[in-house]
Amino acid sequence: PTPKLLQERGLAAVHEETVDPTIGYATAWFEEPSGLDDDWGVLATLPAIPNAPQMGCVIRFPTRRRLHCAVITYGKPRAPRSPDELVARLAELDVPQLHRLLQRAKPVSEVESYGNTQNRWRRYGSLPRFPDGLLVIGDAACSLNPRYGQGMTVAALSADRLDRELGSYLAQHRSLQGFGAHYQRSLEDVLKVPWQMALLEDSLWVSHFSGRAPSLTERLQQASSGRLLRAAFTDIDTYIRFMRVAHLLAPPTTLLTPRTLMRMLSQAPEPAGNDAPGIGPA
C-alpha cells in the first residue's frame, strides 16, 4: 500500500480520515416475472435514523428481462447468503412492494456480499513532501460508501482533473518535477464535496451506533436534508436540482434558489423518532 511505501522512503505518515457506518451490502440477479407491465426503472426505499436501518433497491433491465436487487443494512448485519434469504430480508422493509415483486421472480445468480464499505480519505495533498513519479487516485486516495454511487464518478472527475492539471503544469514548468505533490493538492478540491455528501448521513449513523448524541450541526443537517428529500419527491424542479447535485453534475449551491428553499420550508417536519434520510442517491 502507498502509505507503507512512503514511510519506507522516510516520508511523513499520511493523515487518514475514516467514517465507518458499518453497513452490509448484498446483491443478486433475478429473472423478471411475467406480466410485469408497470412503467418503472428503479424501486427503492431509503433508510431513516434511528428506526429504519435497512434499504432495498430493485433495478429493472427490461430488454434483458432481468432485475438487479440490492439490500443494504446499517449496523454490522449478517449479510444474506442465498437468494431466499435476500428476498426474506426485503419483507422487513416498511414498503411491501419490493418483497412481493421478488417473491415472483426467479433467482439467476448467487448472492454477492461486500463489507468493506467505510468512507476513507487519505490526505496525500497535505503531506509536506511527496515523491515525483507517483500519483494516488481513485479508491487509493478516497473510498466512499458504495450506497451513494459516487465512486466511479469521483474516479472520472479525478482523471479529468489529472488531464487538465498535467497540461497546464507542463506548459508552465516544462517539466514534471514536483507535479505529484501539485496534483495531490489539486485533487483535494475534487474530493471535498462527495466526501461531505457521504458524511451527511453516515456520520449520524456512526453517532447512533456509538450511543453519542448527534451534535447541533448534525441535527440541523439531518433536518434540512430530510426536508430537501421530501421536497424533491413533490416538485420536479427541486428533484432535477437534487439529482444533479447527488450525481456530482452540479455543486450543492445549485440548491440555494428561492424556489427550492421555499419548497423545503413548506415541508412538514418528520415525526419524532422517524427522521428522514440524509442526502444521497438511492
Would you name each region that the model predicts?
Residues P3-K4, P83-D84, L157-D160, Q222, ...:
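A structural signal for well-ordered alpha-helical segments within the folded catalytic domains
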Residues P1-D94:
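Predominantly flavin-linked oxidoreductase catalytic cores and closely associated redox partners
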Residues R64, P77-V190:
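FAD/FMN-dependent oxidoreductases across multiple families
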Residues R164-A282:
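C-terminal helical "tail/cap" subdomain of flavin- and related membrane-associated enzymes
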Residues A28-F30, V58-R60, C69, L90, ...:
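Generic structural hydrophobic/aromatic packing signal, biased to beta-strands
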Residues R66-Y74, C142-T153, S215-A232, A282:
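Short secondary-structure transition/capping segments
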Residues R9, L93, A105, A246-L249, ...:
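Alpha-helix boundary/capping residues
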